[in-house]
Amino acid sequence: MGFLTAVTQGLVRGADRMSKWTSKRGPRTFTKSRGAKKTGIYTSDRKFVQIKEMVPEFVVPDLTGFKLKPYVNYRAPAGIDTPLTAKALFQETVAPAIEKDFKEGTFDANNLEKYGFEPTQEGKLFQLYPKNFPR
């Protein structure tokens, strides 16, 4: 095999397939068959003994009555996630509990620790005020 052929194959197939597979490549548990793990051990007389705990077990949920198909079209538009803001986090977590207590008449403005409010930041690793970074 010529030099140009080897370079061309390396560019087309990818360089990782062109280099020689030696014991120096990959971890000790990685076998030559591209990621397959061993499912047993070899005994002293070179016989392979399969160990049940080493055989991978695939857990598949029951999908009877499931309406969605397992295929997603590659032309489907990408999903849009709005960034999480402090206001949105407050509206999702604390606001329902405050509204419920306000309607029941049990809301106490002096007892905000009930909703997760911390009046001081002493003893915290990362403090919001003063800033953790030097100016």
UniProtKB/Swiss-Prot annotation:
The keyword Ribosomal protein applies. It is found in: Mitochondrion. Its main location: mitochondrion. One of its GO terms (molecular function) is structural constituent of ribosome. Component of the mitochondrial ribosome large subunit (39S) which comprises a 16S rRNA and about 50 distinct proteins. Interacts with BCL2. Belongs to the mitochondrion-specific ribosomal protein mL41 family. This is Large ribosomal subunit protein mL41. It comes from Mus musculus.
